[in-house]
Amino acid sequence: MSEFITVARPYAKAAFDFAVEHNSLDRWQNMLTFSAEVTRNESVAEMLSGALAPETLAAFFIDICGDQLDESGQNFIKVMAENGRLQVIPDVLQQFIALRDAMEATADVEVTSAAPLTQAQLDKISAAMEQRLSRKVKLNCKIDKSVLAGVVIRAGDLVIDGSIRGRLDRLTDVLQS
């Protein structure tokens, strides 16, 4: 977790509240996602850590984002630039998504498998996790050959390791003790 998370929280809350009030959650998430990608660019990161005046920095950033930012998004960037906080936009995005997930009662579930899963398998995992977590889930699938077979499911602090690699690791621990 980033050291900027505490700084990012009030900005994320303000953006989230504005987006809810104006029924524009998708638009705001897209603007924040694009802005976060811009801040990750090496050239932009150097500019953010430089000694540019806030107005110049905001204008530069808004110019790079182009039509990806509407007027309210541009105002948000100006406020963040005035306070020297543009580098925390990725953390603002993370907090914004967390607030949205909490409001929509959804949870991100990461499913790691050795091979692509069928739609039937994904549906079964989704249904089981929705029942276990008592909320809707969004599956994010990854392929990792090191799991050998089976799946590893992560949802927040919950980890369900049904992989062959996990079983072998547990067997090794038992044999060594």
UniProtKB/Swiss-Prot annotation:
Keywords: ATP synthesis, Cell inner membrane, Cell membrane, CF(1), Hydrogen ion transport, Ion transport, Membrane, Transport. PROSITE patterns: ATPASE_DELTA. The keyword Amino-acid biosynthesis does not apply. It is a peripheral membrane protein. One of its GO terms (cellular component) is proton-transporting ATP synthase complex. InterPro entries: ATP_synth_OSCP/delta_N_sf, ATPase_OSCP/d_CS, ATPase_OSCP/dsu. It is found in: Cell inner membrane. F(1)F(0) ATP synthase produces ATP from ADP in the presence of a proton or sodium gradient. F-type ATPases consist of two structural domains, F(1) containing the extramembraneous catalytic core and F(0) containing the membrane proton channel, linked together by a central stalk and a peripheral stalk. During catalysis, ATP synthesis in the catalytic domain of F(1) is coupled via a rotary mechanism of the central stalk subunits to proton translocation. Belongs to the ATPase delta chain family. This is ATP synthase subunit delta.
